[in-house]
Protein backbone atom coordinates (compact mmCIF):
# COMPACT_ATOMS: atom_id res chain seq x y z
CA UNK A 1 0.00 0.00 0.00
CA UNK A 2 1.31 3.44 -0.91
CA UNK A 3 2.14 5.72 2.00
CA UNK A 4 2.39 9.52 2.03
CA UNK A 5 3.96 12.25 4.16
CA UNK A 6 2.48 15.74 3.77
CA UNK A 7 4.73 18.57 4.96
CA UNK A 8 2.60 21.69 4.47
CA UNK A 9 0.81 23.41 7.34
CA UNK A 10 -1.93 21.20 8.75
CA UNK A 11 -4.69 23.58 7.64
CA UNK A 12 -3.28 23.50 4.11
CA UNK A 13 -2.97 19.73 3.94
CA UNK A 14 -6.20 18.65 5.66
CA UNK A 15 -8.22 18.31 2.45
CA UNK A 16 -5.54 16.28 0.68
CA UNK A 17 -4.98 14.11 3.74
CA UNK A 18 -8.70 13.35 3.97
CA UNK A 19 -8.85 12.43 0.28
CA UNK A 20 -5.88 10.10 0.57
CA UNK A 21 -7.19 8.42 3.71
CA UNK A 22 -10.55 7.85 2.04
CA UNK A 23 -8.61 5.92 -0.60
CA UNK A 24 -6.96 3.80 2.08
CA UNK A 25 -3.60 5.56 1.88
CA UNK A 26 -1.68 5.71 5.14
CA UNK A 27 -0.95 9.42 5.52
CA UNK A 28 1.19 11.37 7.98
CA UNK A 29 0.73 15.13 8.28
CA UNK A 30 4.10 16.48 9.35
CA UNK A 31 4.27 20.29 8.97
CA UNK A 32 7.82 21.49 8.40
CA UNK A 33 7.03 25.20 8.48
CA UNK A 34 4.71 27.48 10.41
CA UNK A 35 3.40 30.94 9.58
CA UNK A 36 3.11 34.13 11.59
CA UNK A 37 1.69 37.46 10.32
CA UNK A 38 3.79 40.57 9.84
CA UNK A 39 2.70 44.22 10.04
CA UNK A 40 1.58 45.31 6.57
CA UNK A 41 1.94 48.75 4.99
CA UNK A 42 -1.40 50.51 4.83
CA UNK A 43 -2.60 51.57 1.35
CA UNK A 44 -1.68 55.21 1.86
CA UNK A 45 1.95 54.21 2.42
CA UNK A 46 2.14 52.41 -0.91
CA UNK A 47 3.17 54.48 -3.93
CA UNK A 48 0.24 56.31 -5.50
CA UNK A 49 -1.55 54.44 -8.27
CA UNK A 50 -0.21 55.23 -11.71
CA UNK A 51 -0.66 53.38 -14.98
CA UNK A 52 -1.46 49.67 -15.11
CA UNK A 53 -1.07 47.84 -11.81
CA UNK A 54 -0.86 44.08 -11.33
CA UNK A 55 -1.31 42.43 -7.94
CA UNK A 56 0.23 38.99 -7.45
CA UNK A 57 -0.87 36.92 -4.44
CA UNK A 58 1.63 34.11 -4.01
CA UNK A 59 -0.36 31.92 -1.62
CA UNK A 60 -3.56 31.61 0.36
CA UNK A 61 -1.57 32.92 3.34
CA UNK A 62 -0.86 36.07 1.32
CA UNK A 63 -4.61 36.51 0.87
CA UNK A 64 -5.32 35.87 4.54
CA UNK A 65 -2.68 38.24 5.89
CA UNK A 66 -2.26 40.83 3.13
CA UNK A 67 -5.55 41.45 1.33
CA UNK A 68 -6.96 43.72 4.03
CA UNK A 69 -4.21 46.28 3.34
CA UNK A 70 -4.93 46.61 -0.39
CA UNK A 71 -8.53 45.48 -0.75
CA UNK A 72 -9.61 48.74 -2.42
CA UNK A 73 -6.89 48.39 -5.03
CA UNK A 74 -7.62 44.68 -5.58
CA UNK A 75 -11.29 45.52 -6.15
CA UNK A 76 -10.52 48.26 -8.68
CA UNK A 77 -11.39 47.39 -12.29
CA UNK A 78 -8.15 48.97 -13.48
CA UNK A 79 -6.09 46.46 -11.48
CA UNK A 80 -5.36 42.90 -12.61
CA UNK A 81 -5.12 40.36 -9.79
CA UNK A 82 -3.11 37.16 -10.25
CA UNK A 83 -3.26 34.15 -7.94
CA UNK A 84 -0.49 31.57 -7.72
CA UNK A 85 -2.28 28.25 -7.44
CA UNK A 86 -5.83 27.04 -7.21
CA UNK A 87 -6.03 27.42 -3.43
CA UNK A 88 -4.95 31.05 -3.68
CA UNK A 89 -7.50 31.68 -6.43
CA UNK A 90 -10.26 30.16 -4.30
CA UNK A 91 -9.20 32.29 -1.31
CA UNK A 92 -9.49 35.45 -3.42
CA UNK A 93 -12.82 34.40 -4.90
CA UNK A 94 -14.16 33.78 -1.40
CA UNK A 95 -13.33 37.43 -0.70
CA UNK A 96 -15.19 38.51 -3.89
CA UNK A 97 -11.96 39.41 -5.69
CA UNK A 98 -11.77 38.57 -9.40
CA UNK A 99 -8.44 36.99 -10.28
CA UNK A 100 -6.67 34.91 -12.88
CA UNK A 101 -4.30 32.02 -12.23
CA UNK A 102 -1.62 30.48 -14.45
CA UNK A 103 -1.84 26.75 -15.11
CA UNK A 104 1.72 26.41 -13.90
CA UNK A 105 1.76 27.27 -10.20
CA UNK A 106 5.11 29.03 -9.94
CA UNK A 107 6.99 32.17 -10.95
CA UNK A 108 7.60 30.85 -14.46
CA UNK A 109 3.87 30.29 -14.88
CA UNK A 110 3.14 33.88 -13.89
CA UNK A 111 5.68 35.25 -16.35
CA UNK A 112 4.10 33.23 -19.18
CA UNK A 113 0.68 34.88 -18.73
CA UNK A 114 -0.40 37.00 -21.72
CA UNK A 115 -0.60 40.16 -19.62
CA UNK A 116 3.17 40.05 -19.15
CA UNK A 117 3.73 39.57 -22.88
CA UNK A 118 1.48 42.29 -24.28
CA UNK A 119 0.52 44.88 -21.68
CA UNK A 120 2.48 47.96 -20.67
CA UNK A 121 2.72 47.40 -16.94
CA UNK A 122 4.03 50.16 -14.72
CA UNK A 123 4.14 48.27 -11.45
CA UNK A 124 3.57 44.87 -9.93
CA UNK A 125 2.76 44.51 -6.24
CA UNK A 126 3.72 41.05 -4.97
CA UNK A 127 1.82 40.07 -1.83
CA UNK A 128 3.86 37.32 -0.23
CA UNK A 129 5.78 35.91 2.68
CA UNK A 130 9.13 37.27 3.75
CA UNK A 131 11.75 36.13 1.23
CA UNK A 132 10.97 34.02 -1.83
CA UNK A 133 9.89 34.76 -5.43
CA UNK A 134 13.30 36.18 -6.36
CA UNK A 135 12.98 34.83 -9.90
CA UNK A 136 9.75 36.74 -10.45
CA UNK A 137 11.13 39.99 -9.09
CA UNK A 138 14.36 39.77 -11.10
CA UNK A 139 12.53 38.98 -14.34
CA UNK A 140 10.08 41.86 -13.94
CA UNK A 141 12.72 44.38 -12.96
CA UNK A 142 14.70 43.26 -16.00
CA UNK A 143 11.71 44.26 -18.12
CA UNK A 144 11.67 47.73 -16.61
CA UNK A 145 8.70 47.06 -14.33
CA UNK A 146 8.56 48.57 -10.85
CA UNK A 147 8.14 45.75 -8.32
CA UNK A 148 6.80 46.39 -4.83
CA UNK A 149 7.06 43.60 -2.26
CA UNK A 150 4.27 43.50 0.29
CA UNK A 151 5.54 41.04 2.90
CA UNK A 152 2.63 40.10 5.12
CA UNK A 153 3.82 36.93 6.87
CA UNK A 154 6.96 35.02 7.61
CA UNK A 155 7.75 31.33 7.72
CA UNK A 156 9.62 29.75 10.60
CA UNK A 157 10.67 26.27 11.60
CA UNK A 158 8.48 24.94 14.43
CA UNK A 159 9.58 22.24 16.82
CA UNK A 160 8.85 18.84 15.27
CA UNK A 161 8.54 15.31 16.62
CA UNK A 162 11.32 13.63 14.65
CA UNK A 163 10.64 10.29 16.37
CA UNK A 164 7.13 10.31 14.92
CA UNK A 165 8.52 10.84 11.44
CA UNK A 166 11.20 8.18 11.91
CA UNK A 167 8.62 5.64 13.07
CA UNK A 168 6.46 6.30 10.02
CA UNK A 169 9.45 6.03 7.70
CA UNK A 170 10.56 2.74 9.25
CA UNK A 171 7.33 1.07 8.13
CA UNK A 172 8.11 1.61 4.44
CA UNK A 173 9.37 4.22 2.01
CA UNK A 174 6.63 6.80 1.33
CA UNK A 175 5.94 9.55 -1.13
CA UNK A 176 6.90 12.79 0.61
CA UNK A 177 5.19 15.97 -0.61
CA UNK A 178 7.12 19.23 -0.22
CA UNK A 179 5.94 22.61 -1.47
CA UNK A 180 9.16 24.64 -1.60
CA UNK A 181 12.92 24.54 -1.68
CA UNK A 182 12.99 25.71 1.93
CA UNK A 183 10.97 22.65 2.93
CA UNK A 184 13.40 20.37 1.09
CA UNK A 185 16.31 21.85 3.03
CA UNK A 186 14.48 21.43 6.34
CA UNK A 187 13.46 17.85 5.55
CA UNK A 188 16.99 16.93 4.48
CA UNK A 189 18.26 18.04 7.88
CA UNK A 190 15.78 15.72 9.61
CA UNK A 191 16.17 12.42 7.76
CA UNK A 192 18.92 9.90 7.10
CA UNK A 193 20.70 9.32 3.81
CA UNK A 194 18.90 5.96 3.61
CA UNK A 195 15.56 7.79 3.57
CA UNK A 196 16.88 10.05 0.82
CA UNK A 197 17.76 6.99 -1.25
CA UNK A 198 14.55 5.03 -0.69
CA UNK A 199 11.73 7.58 -0.44
CA UNK A 200 10.22 9.46 -3.37
CA UNK A 201 10.11 13.24 -3.02
CA UNK A 202 7.32 15.10 -4.83
CA UNK A 203 8.34 18.69 -5.59
CA UNK A 204 6.50 21.62 -7.23
CA UNK A 205 8.94 22.61 -9.98
CA UNK A 206 12.06 21.76 -11.92
CA UNK A 207 14.00 24.30 -9.90
CA UNK A 208 13.13 22.57 -6.62
CA UNK A 209 13.78 19.17 -8.21
CA UNK A 210 17.31 20.28 -9.10
CA UNK A 211 17.81 21.54 -5.55
CA UNK A 212 16.56 18.26 -4.07
CA UNK A 213 18.91 16.16 -6.19
CA UNK A 214 21.82 18.40 -5.23
CA UNK A 215 20.96 17.74 -1.58
CA UNK A 216 21.16 13.97 -2.09
CA UNK A 217 17.59 12.90 -2.88
CA UNK A 218 17.62 10.03 -5.39
CA UNK A 219 13.95 9.69 -6.30
CA UNK A 220 12.46 13.06 -7.20
CA UNK A 221 9.09 13.44 -8.91
CA UNK A 222 8.28 16.83 -10.43
CA UNK A 223 4.65 17.98 -10.10
CA UNK A 224 2.98 20.81 -12.00
CA UNK A 225 2.91 23.07 -8.97
CA UNK A 226 2.47 22.72 -5.23
CA UNK A 227 -1.30 22.23 -5.17
CA UNK A 228 -3.33 19.16 -4.26
CA UNK A 229 -4.34 18.35 -7.85
CA UNK A 230 -0.72 18.41 -8.98
CA UNK A 231 0.25 16.00 -6.21
CA UNK A 232 -2.65 13.65 -6.98
CA UNK A 233 -1.52 13.49 -10.62
CA UNK A 234 1.96 12.39 -9.53
CA UNK A 235 0.49 10.06 -6.92
CA UNK A 236 -1.61 8.31 -9.57
CA UNK A 237 1.36 8.09 -11.91
CA UNK A 238 3.48 6.41 -9.25
CA UNK A 239 0.95 3.68 -8.48
Residue ranges and their predicted role:
Residues 1-239:
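Signature of uroporphyrinogen-III synthase
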Amino acid sequence: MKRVVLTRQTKDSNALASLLREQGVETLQFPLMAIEPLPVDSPERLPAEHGLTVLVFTSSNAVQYGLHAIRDLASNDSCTVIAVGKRTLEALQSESIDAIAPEREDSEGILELPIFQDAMIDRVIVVKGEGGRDLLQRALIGRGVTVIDLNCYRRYWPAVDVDKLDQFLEDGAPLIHVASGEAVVRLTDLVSTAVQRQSSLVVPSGRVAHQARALGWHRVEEAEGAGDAAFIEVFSRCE
